Amino acid sequence: MEGFSCSLQPPTASEREDCNRDEPPRKIITEKNTLRQTKLANGTSSMIVPKQRKLSANYEKEKELCVKYFEQWSECDQVEFVEHLISRMCHYQHGHINTYLKPMLQRDFITALPARGLDHIAENILSYLDAKSLCSAELVCKEWYRVTSDGMLWKKLIERMVRTDSLWRGLAERRGWGQYLFKNKPPDGKTPPNSFYRALYPKIIQDIETIESNWRCGRHSLQRIHCRSETSKGVYCLQYDDQKIVSGLRDNTIKIWDKNTLECKRVLMGHTGSVLCLQYDERVIITGSSDSTVRVWDVNTGEMLNTLIHHCEAVLHLRFNNGMMVTCSKDRSIAVWDMASATDITLRRVLVGHRAAVNVVDFDDKYIVSASGDRTIKVWNTSTCEFVRTLNGHKRGIACLQYRDRLVVSGSSDNTIRLWDIECGACLRVLEGHEELVRCIRFDNKRIVSGAYDGKIKVWDLVAALDPRAPAGTLCLRTLVEHSGRVFRLQFDEFQIVSSSHDDTILIWDFLNDPGLA
């Protein structure tokens, strides 16, 4: 290697003196040593490089002899010799060798793997890249581009996003490109090439950005269902999925609507009072009424399967999940039920502690949370049904709440919304803006959506609301005004809000298909 002697003979005294000239204290930069330091235009120093040296007279002859001996040794001998040789070198020589070795130690393993028949490993490695990195990988060289193309890595990236993100999953269903994912054969039987998915990805991102912008700016399309109640008007409760909307009405009926055609598919009758609350899953619809009963219906046939008689006044709210149901009533009590089946529902425990009507309940595996006209939120242990703590802060009765993870969001007749940490009972934020009682509230990871007796629906920034540094005036993103009466209930997802009102209508606010963009 140029720049140092490679003789196998012990160094002469003069050679040792020359090599040890920079030994400790090693001054890299002196007036007499063999290094020079250049200055860059900005005043910083460049790397230190050796000056050109004249090679000794015997170097060329001895170099070939060194190489000849070196090649005759075993690999272990070669390594030991090089280590010994390096240990005798000066600091700047180490730097010179390091610069020489760096490119030799770099390996394009993505290109090397297919050459050994290991394409699948190269594809698997690159499949962990995000979109920006995958774009860069395509530009490295032709072989990297071939690996990304043959491995259908854009398809795999989109599939990964659909599996892990509900917004992507919803877009796949609504836009129709979900049929080209997860090894499903498309209708024409032909699998699109990688370029199809490469072009699809930015279109998905554009859709997502449009949805976010529409939510913030209030751009939406609107569909309206007129419930046409024959007696008293008002839609007290609802729940929806992609196919249907189930609504509970003031005229004592449950109406099921086709979400696409907006036509009424079925009317369930049996309650003798207004239907105030409901929930359904893939098997049953469970409803609570001002007639003090809870009724269970077959979700597919509409047949009434069970009637639960326990509360002595109106059943104001209910929730069920994983074989358990919780109901609450104007009679100030909370009932906890075990659900073995639709026809086998037994009362487990009655929770008493509120001093006024219990308007709403929610629960998970850890806590049952209830809110009342007595201005308090109470927390109960789900397993033992024992009381845990009370959340105090609202100035008037509480009409609605939702609980998930550590967060409770509540709405009150004091016209405010409060965010609570359920573990310590602290109020994290107070949201002000509604002019009358806040009747319904829902939240997800990004937003809070509230409806009130002022007829308005407000969209709030949840992330900002949880940041104590965020100014109060920036938290309400948009106010939606279309209902002509009190807003009783709402539900929302990434794409839409569905709301019901005292004006006897159900509104579908679609933030994906903004007519202004058509």
Curated annotation (Swiss-Prot):
InterPro entries: Beta-TrCP_D (IPR021977), F-box-like_dom_sf (IPR036047), F-box_dom (IPR001810), G-protein_beta_WD-40_rep (IPR020472), WD-F-box_domain-protein (IPR050995), WD40/YVTN_repeat-like_dom_sf (IPR015943), WD40_repeat_CS (IPR019775), WD40_repeat_dom_sf (IPR036322). It comes from the Eukaryota. Residues 1-12 have a biased composition (Polar residues). Transmembrane segments: none annotated. Residues 1-24 are annotated as: Disordered. Residues 119-157 form the F-box domain. One of its GO terms (biological process) is Wnt signaling pathway. SUPFAM superfamilies: F-box domain, WD40 repeat-like. It holds the Pfam family F-box-like. SMART domains: Beta-TrCP_D, FBOX, WD40. Residues 14-24 have a biased composition (Basic and acidic residues). Keywords: Repeat, Ubl conjugation pathway, WD repeat, Wnt signaling pathway. One of its GO terms (molecular function) is phosphoprotein binding. WD repeats lie at residues 230-258, 270-298, 310-338, 353-381, 393-421, 433-461, 482-510. The keyword Magnesium does not apply. Substrate recognition component of a SCF (SKP1-CUL1-F-box protein) E3 ubiquitin-protein ligase complex which mediates the ubiquitination and subsequent proteasomal degradation of target proteins. Probably recognizes and binds to phosphorylated target proteins. May participate in Wnt signaling. Part of a SCF (SKP1-cullin-F-box) ubiquitin-protein ligase complex. Interacts with fbxo5. This is Beta-TrCP. It comes from Xenopus laevis (African clawed frog).
